């Protein structure tokens, strides 16, 4: 079974149309996949079913994820050039209110960067120190029933970090996380 997983970056905002704003794209894609007969399922359910011989999924199953877990995943925020942005969670809520029962499995998974130090460094280096990479919202997002939180990585292996979990201190992409030991280091650090 092939299952599409559509991924968005809530900080991907350079305008207010489909091609330049992942919030606009996500809201549009929710409508599109529903009209096309796809059934949205929580990513954790898909994984459970794929690894459990007794689990079943609808034939046209799809999942949604958000990468890097900025505060735009959870809260409506003003973008400095594109104006007010509806959060990914509130887009899910809006869809559920507009289409009651249309997607019983409505859910998205936000992949978070576990290290508070990495989030702070990335916020300073990549988001001009706007304070948009917090973890205070994670429990409330999960409690909504519409969003899950999963581990993206410990430190994003980001070049702005003084030290990363990667064994040779190679930074800038995930291609150098190429051994079980490096992957385990990311998981071990996140579990602390």
Where are these regions (language model features)?
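Active-site beta->alpha N-cap acidic-glycine motif
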Residues: 3, 10-146, 157-158
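Amphipathic, alpha-helical segments enriched in basic
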Residues: 8, 13-15, 165, 169
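Alpha-helical scaffold elements lining the catalytic groove of polysaccharide deacetylases
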Residues: 77, 82, 139-143, 155-192
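Non-cysteine beta-strand/loop elements that form the S-adenosyl-L-methionine
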Residues: 147-152
């Amino acid at each position: 079974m092939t299952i599409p997983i559509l991924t968005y970056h809530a900080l991907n905002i350079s305008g207010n149309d489909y091609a330049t704003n992942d919030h606009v794209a996500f809201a549009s894609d929710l409508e599109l996949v529903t009209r096309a007969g796809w059934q949205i399922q929580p990513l954790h359910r898909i994984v459970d079913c794929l690894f459990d011989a007794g689990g079943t999924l609808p034939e046209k199953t799809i999942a949604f994820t958000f990468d890097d877990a900025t505060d735009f995943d959870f809260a409506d925020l003003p973008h400095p050039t594109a104006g007010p942005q509806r959060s990914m969670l509130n887009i899910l809520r809006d869809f559920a209110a507009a289409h009651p029962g249309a997607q019983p499995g409505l859910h998205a998974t936000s992949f978070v960067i576990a290290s508070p130090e990495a989030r702070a460094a990335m916020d300073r280096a990549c988001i001009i120190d706007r304070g948009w990479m917090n973890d205070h919202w994670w429990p409330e997002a999960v409690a909504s029933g519409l969003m899950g939180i999963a581990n993206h990585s410990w430190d994003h292996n980001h070049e702005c970090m003084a030290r990363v979990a990667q064994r040779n201190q190679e930074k800038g992409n995930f291609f150098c996380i190429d051994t079980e030991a490096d992957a385990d280091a990311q998981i071990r650090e996140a579990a602390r």
